[in-house]
Amino acid sequence: MSKKVCLIIGGGRGMGAATARQMHSRKYKLALMSPSTSCETLAAELGGIALRGRAENKGELKAIFDLTMLTYGRIDSILIHVGGPPKGDLLDISEEDWDKANDMVLKPVIRMAKLATPVMEKQGGGSIVNITTFSAFEPS
């Protein structure tokens, strides 16, 4: 069997980058996406592929999925690590801010599951892990 493949959304820094390094140490091939160039730098260091993009952008999410499948022919693990909901008092948070949070936190999970499930079923399995944060500014 060929090496397993891990796709990480939010894989440029922090927990996403740490997960990329851990998966690389376990001999996974990597595909990384983040809005900054940090994903490209890390992918080059670890021998993976990268695409700058935002999780809430449907086209960019599909582009990294398609690039991963084109490059590696499979996806075994997906980590979606994105920001959290708006901060502040409930009554002060606008409907628009909640909509933006859903676009960032919830929709990428649904979109990636719809893309990956047929592939993972055909392969006989896989895993999708979703992580979000709330009010995290530094590790404890």
Task: Briefly describe each language-model feature range.
Residues 46-59:
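Rossmann-fold cofactor-recognition segment
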Residues 129-140:
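Catalytic loop of short-chain dehydrogenase/reductase
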Residues 26-41:
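Conserved glycine-rich Rossmann-like NAD(P)H-binding loop of the short-chain dehydrogenase/reductase
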Residues 12-13:
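Conserved glycine-rich cofactor-binding loop
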Residues 113-114:
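A short, exposed helix-loop element centered on a Lys and neighboring polar residues
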Residues 89-90, 97-102:
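Substrate-binding pocket helix/loop in short-chain dehydrogenase/reductase
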Residues 81-86:
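Conserved NAD(P)H cofactor-binding loop of Rossmann-fold oxidoreductase domains
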